[in-house]
A protein has these predicted regions:
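ATP-dependent adenylate-handling active sites, centered on carboxylate activation for C-N bond formation
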Residues: 13-16, 113-116, 121-127, 131-132, ...
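Structural motif
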Residues: 92, 96, 152-156, 410-422, ...
Length: 571
């Protein structure tokens, strides 16, 4: 059961709510779920040891699920949380909430005939909605305890499964299940007897368009505020990968918060390019903490492990590295930590992507005032000539790449320059990191660099400023120059695990061949006939493709699991 699991039921009337709950109440109790909020029209159930705070509205017609902070990073008191759930949740109110508050939350409000759901802009808490028997269901996770409540008509959407296979590993907003509606990060979704409608209250492009170029945000202040608020006084397992982003998260914690970290974990492999212990050790020495070094050996890749991660509304791309996730999950449990703290998302929000499009942004934003030195530095950084033909080619390639994406954040990029649009695409992809994984069953997986304050700071800065001087994440490096060891700041390479994963997957080819070529996807005609030729050690080690195979295996396990779940539900 995911630590962030909960299901909210809102009845059209009290009788409909009780009819829905009564036959499932014992099932919930046997599985360790309990009622967290109860009112005539509304009920919330979650695992007894779950990590989501649940506060019912004072009038009984709304609920706040998760944690929420004000602009100064202070958590709202229970009374204020209860008041927040009392107010009507229309577009104006939703915009005010997203402007005044941030966090990891869902805000739900019932009114006559419909239910309004606001999902926070970070997307840290999942949200899927549906209707059945006069009740609106809002789920943050897909544990099979909820199966009796799923729509009777719900089934596998093979068209969406095919889309997942065409673009393996990428976050896809639409669900491969019918009659279930995903709510995007920053979306206000209203659903009721007469149907529903949606408004995207927060989107990255709007943050960029509203920016004040004369008053750039304080990137460091935004990071420190978010990291410290989300960490709170809890006990954590923290990632120290050896990269810049996890080093920044470590630096942003207060001294007292660092003292509460139960383990600073670095995973390494016996390949030079995948061994970042020297960098992680430098961060640990800088803060006077002990580094836990975990040597990686192969991948635990079998049907049982893949199925363990398949209880999600989508194939769990965030669980693509089973050994990493299993190790963190075990440490959370053994050390009685609240969850894991990571640097995920920093590449997108701080702009790590090497691209000529940054030069095009300089021209786009400054027109005739474009600075020649900026263009020269970009060309030198990328070792490519900054010809207009090259810029146009890269721009066309980026537009083509995101054309098949379905995320609402990408639906309106008008007046957003090319490199900034690339950043928005990267942030949409990073919703993968907010998704479920085995480690999130033991405790919340918190990614502070994907929080609303940090995303807004990164989006409000131009791509030129973020990469000033022709350096990836230059603004972040400058902001934390006094807090991160120079060994990290001056580093120009990134850890590379491709060779390790390639060899690890190659060792599991006999299993993958049987699992994929004789599985549900093959039966549905969705496996490329050429896959057989790619399932060889030579092809994998010399031409790559391990990520595609792992994603295919996850999708296969997901289809098998949901086929069984839906079949049992109908018996």
């Amino acid at each position: 059961v995911a630590a962030d699991s909960a299901i909210i039921l809102v009845g059209d009337d009290p009788a409909a709510l009780q009819v829905a709950i009564a036959p499932v109440r014992k099932r919930l109790s046997r599985r360790g779920w309990s009622c967290k909020a109860n009112a005539p029209f509304l009920a919330v159930f979650a695992p007894s040891g779950g990590r989501l705070d649940v506060t019912g509205a004072l009038d009984g017609h709304g609920v706040l699920v998760g944690e929420i902070f004000d602009g100064a990073g202070a958590a709202l008191a229970p009374e204020a949380r209860g008041v927040l759930g009392c107010r009507p949740l229309d577009e104006a109110r939703a915009r005010a909430v997203c402007s005044d508050y941030w966090g990891r939350y869902l805000l739900i409000r019932r009114s006559a005939g419909e239910v309004a759901i606001l999902r926070d802009p970070s997307g840290a808490v999942d949200c899927v909605v549906w209707r059945r028997g006069g009740v609106t269901f809002v789920a943050t996770g897909a544990d099979d305890v909820i199966d009796p409540w799923l729509p009777e008509s719900s089934g596998i959407d093979w068209g969406e499964v095919a889309a997942l296979i065409r673009r393996p590993g990428e976050h896809r907003h639409r669900l491969p299940l019918t009659d279930l509606t995903p709510v995007a990060a920053g979306e206000l979704r209203t659903i009721g007897k007469a149907g529903g409608h949606s408004q995207q209250i927060w989107r990255p492009a709007d943050v960029y368009r509203r920016r004040d170029a004369n008053e750039p945000p304080d990137l460091k202040a935004a990071v420190v505020l978010a990291v410290r608020a989300l960490a709170g006084s809890r006990r954590w397992v923290a990632e120290l990968s050896g990269g810049l982003d996890s080093a920044i998260v470590a630096a942003a914690l207060s001294i007292d918060q660092r003292a509460k970290v139960a383990a600073w974990v670095n995973h390494y492999v016996d390949h030079r390019e995948g061994d970042e212990r020297d960098y992680a050790r430098a961060v640990a020495r800088h803060h006077g903490v002990v580094l836990t070094e975990v040597r990686r050996e192969g991948l635990r890749l079998n049907a049982q492990r893949l199925e363990a991660g398949a209880d999600a509304f989508r194939p769990a791309s965030n669980d693509i590295d089973p050994d990493y996730n299993d190790d963190i999950a075990e440490r959370i449990g053994a050390l009685e930590a609240w969850g894991s703290l990571t640097g995920q998302g920093g590449d997108a929000v701080f702009f790590q992507m090497p691209t000529l499009l940054v030069g095009l942004d300089e021209i786009w934003e400054r027109r005739l005032g474009a600075r020649v030195e900026v263009l020269h530095r970009m060309s030198r950084w990328l070792r490519r000539p900054l010809w207009l033909t090259a810029l146009a080619r890269d721009w066309r390639e980026e537009v083509r790449h995101r054309a098949g994406w379905t995320h609402p954040w990408l639906e309106d990029l008008k007046s957003v320059p090319p490199a900034k649009a690339l950043q928005v695409s990267a942030l949409a992809f990073c919703q993968t990191f907010q998704g479920p994984a085995i480690r999130s069953r033991r405790g919340a997986c918190v990614n502070p660099l994907l929080s609303q304050p940090v995303m807004e700071a990164g989006l409000a800065l131009s791509s030129v400023d973020l990469t000033w001087g022709g350096r990836d994440r230059a603004a972040a490096r400058a902001a934390f120059a006094d807090d991160v060891p120079s060994l990290i700041l001056d580093r120009r390479s990134k850890g590379e695990l491709g060779a390790y994963y390639g060899q690890a997957v190659a060792h599991r080819l006999p299993f993958l061949r049987e699992f994929l070529l004789g599985g549900a996807l093959a039966q549905a005609g969705l496996i490329d006939p050429a896959l057989d030729a790619r399932l060889t050690r030579d092809h994998l080690l010399w031409r790559g493709g391990h990520s595609e195979l792992l994603s295919l295996a996850q999708t296969e396990a997901w289809v098998r699991r949901w086929r069984d779940r839906l079949g049992r539900r109908r018996v």
